A protein has these predicted regions:
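Core alpha/beta catalytic barrel or barrel-like domain that forms the active/cofactor pocket
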Residues: 189, 196-203, 237-253, 276, ...
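Active-site-proximal loop/hinge segments that shape catalytic or ion-binding/gating pockets
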Residues: 218-222, 227-282
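Short helix-loop-beta-strand segments that form the rim/entrance of peptidase-like active sites
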Residues: 140-148, 159-206
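Short, charged loop segments at secondary-structure junctions
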Residues: 204-214
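Intrinsic-disorder/low-complexity accessory segments
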Residues: 5-93, 99-104, 110-111, 116-156, ...
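Secretory targeting and sorting signals
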Residues: 1-3
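Amphipathic alpha-helical segments in well-structured domains
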Residues: 162-166, 222, 664, 807
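Histidine/cysteine- and/or acidic
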Residues: 175-179, 210, 218-220
Length: 825
C-alpha cells in the first residue's frame, strides 16, 4: 500500500512560529470594486474582452514552464475568439486586486435557452419533489460540472491542465464532444488564488489558506467561489491540488461529515474516484520510469487522517450546494517548497509536465463520468434537496453501499425542527445576530423574520426574531453551521484539520434550537438582516458596550476621528459633542449606543499595536480597526522604534531569547510604559522569558481543537458569549502569582463541546487535565506593563467572530490601565 498521505496545514500549528510579514494584509482592499454583476439569463457564448495584466517576469509559474498569471487573460481572449463554446466572466478580485476568471464551456444557447436552464436549476432546488416527478427534466437540463484550480497558489498545474482541456473542448470536431457540451456546462475557476500563483505561496495575499475558509468566507476569493457554486449548482466538482505521490483521489477516510446525504455522496464520489484512477493509470507513469507511484484513494487505502469532516474545504463545502460527487485530487510530483528552490529547472519542468497530464486526465474522467451518469446524477441532486425540503430524518448509510464501507464510516446527526435567532432582550447581541443572518443568507440558507410575536418550543419570541426552518433544501448547510457539533475524540486518533466549530456558539449571537413541534409562525423571507444601528434621542454622553467586533470597529473609527473616548469596564463612553460622529458609526457598523450618564473610567487613545502574529490574526486585528505594525525577532533586532506603540501582541515569530542585547534593552524600556497581550505557546514562552506574569503554561495535545465551555467572572476582560470559546493547541496556566487574575477558565465539568481533543500518548494534555484551569489571565508586571495571556484561540482564521472583542478589550485595557480615572462630562 502507499504511504499514509500527509496533509499540509494551513493557518494551523505553524501559526505559532511564523509571524506575518509586513507585506501581508497591508490594507483591507475593496476587492469587488468595478466587478460587473452576472446576468444569469444571458445566452452563451458570453464573450468578455479581458483586460491584460502587466507582464511580470518574476511570476513563480515561469520557472516551472507553466503559464504565468499575466498569460491567462490573452489565452482566454484568444479561445473566445476561436469559436462559440467558450465564455469568460470576471467573478471577483483577489485580495491584491487580480481578476478571478470563470470559464464556461458549453454548446451555444440563446437567451431563452439560458433562461430555461436557470428555470430548471431553480426548480431542482426550490421544488425538488416536483422536479423528481418530471421525467423529461434530465433530457432538458445541462448537468453542471465545476473544476476548481490552483486554490493553493504554489500548487500550480491545475490551471494549466484546465486551459488544456478548455482548448480541447473548444476546438474539437469529435461528435462526442459536441454531444457532451449539449448535455453539460463545464465551469472552470481557472486560478482561484492568483496572488499565491504569482508569488509561489500556498496562501493568498492576506496570508490565508483559502481551502480552510469556506464556512467563514473571510477572503474575497472564497466568496467568489461560494457564489459560483450557488449560481451553478454543480452535480460534480473537482479541486486540483498537489503534491501527494501517488496521486491522491478522494473520497476520504472517516470521520465523514454528518450533515451530508452520504449514501448519495459516497456512491457517486467513489465511482468517479475509480474512474479518475483508471484514467491516470492509463497514462503509463511508473515508479521506475518516472518516479510516479500508483494513485491512492484514502477511503479505500487509509484508515484515518484524510477525512471530510469539516466543511472548510472546497470539496467538503460543495455537497451542501448540490454536488453529489466532490473530490480533492493531489497530483504527485512535488515542485514547491525546497524542491522549487533546489532542483534543476529541467527536473522541475519534467515534474510539472507530469502533474499537468495527470490533472487533465482527472478533468476528462470527471466530465466522462457526468456524461455517462447524467440522468442519475441529476436525480441524486434532486433527492438531496428533496430530503431537506421534506424534513426527513438523516439516513444511516447502509454498510457495504460501496466496497469497504463499514461501521467506522457511519456518522449521522439529528436535525432540529428549526433554529430561532431571537430579537429583543433574549438576544445577547443584535449586531452579532444580524451578521449571522447575513452570513446564512450569503450561503443560500433560507431565513425568515417574524411579523408578529410567536411561541415556539415552549418559548415566546418577539416580532423581528429570525427563524431558520429546517425543512429547506439546504438544511445540511444550515445545520452544519448552527448545530453545536460533536466530540469525535473517541472514534479517531488523527484528524486532517479542525474538528469543532459552531456559528451558533462562537459568532456572538443567541441562537435557540427547536427540536420539534408545529411551525405556525407568521414570518416572511428576508434577503438581508434588518438594520441594528441606533443612537438614543436623549441628550448627554453616549455609551457603547463593546461585545462585538463591529462595536470594536466603531470605537476605533471614533478614535481615528479624534473623538475623546473614555474606557470604563468594557464600555466606551463618548461625550455629547460627538453625537454626530456616533450616529455615523452606528449606521456604518450596525451598533446601538445607549445613554451613558456619569461614568468613571480612563481616557482611551487610538491603540497602536506591534504584532508578532500569524497572518490571520494580523488580518483580524486590522479588520477591527487597530493600527498594527507587524514585528518579529528579526524586525526587533534590526532596530525597532517603540515610540509609536502602545501594546505588543505576541503569538508567533518572536523569540525573546534570540533577541540581541540592544533589542532586548529597547523592549525592556517599552515594558515600563506599554502593554502586552499574548496568545498560544509562543506568547506563553515570551511571557516566561520576559519575566512578566507569574504563571506556568501547560500545553494540551498539539492537534487538539474545538469548541469548549468556559466560565468568566463578572467584570472579566474576556467575557465569553454564552460560555463558549475555541481552542487549537490549547494552553492553560497554573502556579499563578498574587498579581495574576483569572479572566476565563475551562469548565470544571469538562471543557470540550465539539471537536477532537485526546490526551497525549503519555496521558498528559487531555481535556480532563484542563478542567477548571485558567484559560485567560491578566496582571501587572512590576515594570508597569499591563499583561493579558490567552490560552485559547480567539481570532483563529478570522472565524470565531464572537471572541474577537476579548482581544480588543485586552488591548484597550492594556493600553489604558495606567490612566487616571476621569468623570465623563
Amino acid at each position: 500500500p502507499p504511504p499514509a498521505p500527509v496533509r499540509d496545514f494551513g493557518n494551523g500549528p505553524e501559526r505559532n512560529a511564523e509571524a506575518a510579514g509586513t507585506e501581508q494584509s497591508a490594507t483591507l482592499r475593496a476587492t469587488t470594486t468595478g466587478v460587473p454583476g452576472r446576468d444569469h439569463d444571458r445566452g452563451y457564448p458570453r464573450r468578455t474582452e479581458l483586460p491584460l495584466p502587466a507582464a511580470n517576469p518574476a511570476d513563480a509559474a515561469i520557472k516551472l514552464g507553466l503559464i504565468p498569471y499575466h498569460g491567462i487573460a490573452p489565452k482566454l481572449n484568444d479561445l473566445q475568439r476561436r469559436g462559440d463554446r467558450v465564455s469568460v466572466e470576471v467573478i471577483g478580485r483577489s485580495h491584491q486586486g487580480r481578476d478571478l476568471y470563470l470559464v464556461t464551456v458549453t454548446a451555444p444557447e440563446s437567451r431563452s435557452e439560458a433562461r430555461e436552464q436557470s428555470r430548471i436549476r431553480a426548480l431542482v432546488e426550490n421544488d425538488p419533489a416536483r422536479a423528481a416527478r418530471d421525467r423529461r427534466l434530465p433530457a432538458r437540463y445541462k448537468a453542471p460540472i465545476f473544476v476548481n484550480d490552483n486554490i493553493h497558489g504554489n500548487e500550480w498545474e491545475g490551471t494549466d491542465a484546465a486551459l488544456r482541456v478548455i482548448e480541447e473542448l473548444a476546438t474539437s470536431t469529435d461528435p462526442a464532444v459536441a454531444d457532451l457540451l449539449g448535455r453539460t456546462r463545464l465551469y472552470f475557476n481557472v486560478t482561484a488564488n492568483p496572488d499565491g500563483r504569482v508569488a509561489g505561496t500556498r496562501a493568498n495575499g492576506a496570508g490565508f489558506d483559502l481551502n480552510r475558509d469556506f464556512i467563514t468566507a473571510s477572503q474575497p476569493e472564497v466568496r467568489a467561489m461560494r457564489q459560483v457554486m450557488i449560481d451553478t449548482q454543480p452535480v460534480a466538482m473537482i479541486d486540483l491540488h498537489g503534491y501527494v505521490n501517488g496521486t491522491l483521489i478522494e473520497p476520504t477516510t472517516p470521520p465523514h461529515g454528518a450533515n451530508y446525504e452520504y449514501d448519495l455522496f459516497i456512491r457517486n464520489t467513489y465511482a468517479n474516484g475509480l474512474g479518475m484512477e483508471a484514467a491516470i493509470l492509463a497514462l503509463g507513469h511508473t515508479p521506475g520510469k518516472d518516479g510516479v507511484r500508483p494513485p491512492q484513494i484514502p477511503f479505500r487505502d487509509s484508515a484515518e487522517g484524510w477525512d471530510d469532516w469539516p466543511p472548510i474545504f472546497t470539496p467538503q463545502y460543495a455537497p451542501f450546494q448540490g454536488a453529489v460527487a466532490s473530490h480533492t485530487i493531489e497530483f504527485p510530483m512535488r515542485v514547491n517548497g525546497s524542491d522549487y528552490v533546489n532542483l534543476p529547472v529541467e527536473e522541475l519542468r519534467r515534474r510539472s509536465a507530469i502533474n499537468t497530464d495527470i490533472a487533465a486526465a482527472a478533468i476528462r474522467a470527471t466530465y466522462g463520468f457526468v456524461r455517462d451518469r447524467h440522468d442519475a446524477l441529476i436525480a441524486d441532486q434532486i433527492e438531496v434537496f428533496r430530503r431537506g425540503a421534506a424534513g426527513e430524518p438523516a439516513r444511516e448509510v447502509p454498510l457495504g453501499i460501496v466496497p469497504g464501507f463499514g461501521p467506522e464510516d457511519v456518522y449521522t446527526t439529528t436535525y432540529p425542527r428549526a433554529y430561532v435567532i431571537p430579537a429583543g432582550p433574549a438576544q445577547r447581541s443584535a449586531t452579532a445576530a444580524a451578521r449571522l443572518v447575513d452570513h446564512l443568507i450569503a450561503n443560500d440558507v433560507r431565513v425568515e423574520r417574524a411579523r408578529r410575536p410567536f411561541r415556539l418550543g415552549g418559548t415566546s419570541y418577539p416580532a423581528g426574531s429570525y427563524l431558520v426552518d429546517m425543512r429547506q433544501p439546504k438544511r445540511g448547510l444550515a445545520n452544519v453551521m448552527l448545530e453545536p457539533g460533536a466530540d469525535i475524540s473517541p472514534r479517531v486518533d488523527a484528524m486532517y484539520d479542525i474538528s469543532g466549530w459552531s456559528h451558533a456558539l462562537l459568532w456572538g449571537a443567541t441562537v435557540d434550537t427547536v427540536t420539534g413541534g408545529s411551525l405556525r409562525v407568521p414570518a416572511e423571507p428576508v434577503l438581508a438582516a434588518a438594520p441594528t444601528g441606533s443612537v438614543p434621542r436623549t441628550s448627554g454622553p453616549l455609551a457603547l458596550r463593546v461585545g462585538d467586533a463591529q462595536e470594536v470597529r466603531a470605537v476605533n473609527d471614533l478614535l481615528a476621528q479624534g473623538v475623546e473616548v473614555t474606557w470604563a469596564d468594557g464600555v466606551a463612553v463618548v461625550p455629547a459633542s460627538a453625537r454626530d460622529a456616533a450616529r455615523t458609526v452606528a449606521g456604518r457598523y450596525g451598533v446601538a449606543f445607549a445613554r451613558a450618564g456619569a461614568a468613571r473610567g480612563v481616557p482611551l487613545g487610538r491603540v497602536r499595536v506591534a504584532a508578532a502574529a500569524s497572518a490571520d490574526e494580523l488580518f483580524t486585528l486590522r479588520e477591527m480597526g487597530f493600527d498594527v505594525t507587524p514585528v518579529s525577532t528579526a524586525v526587533l533586532d534590526a532596530g525597532f522604534d517603540w515610540s509609536g506603540v502602545d501594546v505588543l501582541f505576541v503569538s508567533s515569530g518572536l523569540n525573546h531569547a534570540a533577541l540581541g542585547e540592544q533589542a532586548r534593552a529597547a523592549l525592556e524600556a517599552f515594558l515600563a510604559t506599554g502593554g502586552v497581550v499574548t496568545r498560544g505557546g509562543t506568547g506563553a514562552a515570551f511571557n516566561t522569558a520576559a519575566g512578566l506574569l507569574t504563571a506556568t503554561p501547560v500545553a494540551g495535545r498539539g492537534d487538539a481543537n474545538g469548541v469548549v465551555r468556559v466560565t468568566s467572572p463578572d467584570g472579566s476582560l474576556a467575557p465569553a458569549p454564552g460560555g463558549h470559546s475555541f481552542v487549537y493547541s490549547p494552553r492553560w496556566f497554573t502556579g499563578l502569582g498574587p498579581e495574576v487574575k483569572v479572566e476565563q477558565a475551562y469548565a470544571a465539568d469538562g471543557p470540550l463541546v465539539s471537536g477532537h481533543w485526546r490526551a497525549a500518548a503519555d496521558g498528559t494534555g487531555g481535556p480532563d487535565a484542563a478542567r477548571g484551569q485558567a484559560a485567560v489571565i491578566s496582571g501587572r508586571d512590576e515594570r508597569g506593563a499591563a499583561v493579558v495571556l490567552f490560552g485559547t484561540e480567539p481570532m483563529f482564521r478570522n472565524h470565531p467572530k464572537g471572541l474577537f472583542p476579548q482581544v480588543a478589550t485586552a488591548l484597550y485595557w492594556s493600553a489604558a490601565v495606567t490612566g487616571a480615572a476621569v468623570t465623563t462630562p
